[in-house]
Amino acid sequence: MKGLEYDTSRTGLDAVLKDWQQKATQVVWSSPEGANSRTVHVKVNQMLKGETISRASIINFLEAMREIGVLKGEEKTGKGGYHWVYYPAMDEAGFKRFITEQILSSLMKSFPNETKEALKNINP
């Protein structure tokens, strides 16, 4: 995941994140003291009620979000060796701004005149 993908057929965070990814992000947002992948994995699977997501998927997602700056991470030592603890780098409102900025920035690079014109024509 080098960046986020936006599905124009969906709305809200559903356009950017799968259900389990939203839940994983919520777990970290609600844990200012930080959360490791095991904690996120357990809580997400409890929230999914009947469905499950692998710990590897959780780890890959958390790392991708850390790499693009949505989450912060700190490598710590503990029982069993090293592990990452993830912290919010931004809250939900900040994440929504981040998504918007990423999309608009990409559009401005690809279609600067058309993007400016389209933004003028949008009625809030």
Model-identified regions with their sequence ranges:
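Short alpha-helical segments that sit at the start of domains
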Residues: 1-26, 31-34, 91
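Short, cationic-aromatic polyanion-contact patches
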Residues: 17, 76-97
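Short acidic, hydrophobic short linear motifs in intrinsically disordered regions
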Residues: 34-44
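Short helix-coil junctions and helix-kink-helix linkers
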Residues: 42-55
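Amphipathic alpha-helical dimerization/coiled-coil segments
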Residues: 93-124
